Amino acid sequence: MQQSKAKKIAISLLLTLAMLVSAQAAEISSLIPIGHTVGIQMSAEGVLVVHLRAVQTPEGEAWPARDAGVSEGDTIVSVSGTEVSSNDDLQKQIAFSGGQPVELELVRDGAHQNVTVTPSQDEDGAYRIGILARDSMAGIGTLTYVDPETGEYGSLGHGICDSETGVLMPLKEGSLIYSMVGSVQRGEAGEPGALQGEFTADSTLGTVEENTESGIFGTMTDASLYSSLEAVPVADADEIRTGDAEILTNVEGDAVEKYSVQVVKVYPEDDEYGRGMMIRVTDQELLDKTGGIVQGM
């Protein structure tokens, strides 16, 4: 009976725990459920094109990138054979071109392709190709579980996507950072709400090694969040049942608390939208604090 209860908590603890580990369930017997927020910093593999925009030249508007076939959501990984990993790298290569055509290596929908772009000189004399790009991101999310044997973790239950394009951020490297919840933007009808976190870059807890549709994954380098916690048995996805459950979450400071929820629906593992389960918050204390499930939980 005790093991059954522990298994029930393990599979319903953080919305998508069982879905995150279902592919590994045959190999992993137990995991430590966490529920603590963490800061997440990621550097992109290449430079993500967020917007295409006109270059203002003395002759009028020019659209070098758009006219060459570059699209929003593309990732630029090299310029004329030179790898770029930041906006600064990209701008330097465009400046070095002196207005001569450059070959951009792009990744679009997982496939590589090359396009030739001729930079335009703007009204200030700088060479530009007419894009707004992003090379990194930072935010907070919830650490879902840690494998006590290896220190490997899973977090979020969904991938980290660029807020402008919706494209999964191509990961070069990243880190988890100790975080505290400073405030909560309550969820309302039509507005998801969000946890507002505070973190500093010198309190690293682990690495981010994968950014996937199912969540982010990596290895903990600091065990302070889970060294005193116990592991619970892992269930297969087909063992999940609807009904009462509990979640662990951190919505004030650095305190992790249990709250009551109800698992309303369980989706099949091959769900086309990648859903794991639908839950309804039944705990009045959590509803009073957050209005329900909010971003970052």
Where are these regions (language model features)?
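Hydrophobic beta-strand signal
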Residues: 76-78, 103, 246
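Gram-positive cell-envelope targeting signals
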Residues: 1-32, 36-38, 143, 166
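PDZ-domain C-terminal substructure recognizer with occasional recognition of PDZ-binding tails
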Residues: 28, 36-38, 71, 91-130
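Short, Lys/Arg- and Gly-enriched loop/turn segments at beta-strand edges
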Residues: 82-93, 114, 256-258
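Short, surface-exposed secondary-structure boundary micro-motifs
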Residues: 81-82, 107, 250
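Serine endopeptidase catalytic core focused on the charge-relay Asp
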Residues: 121, 125-296
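PDZ/PDZ-like groove recognition
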Residues: 36-71, 275-280, 285
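Conserved PDZ fold ligand-binding element
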Residues: 65-87, 297
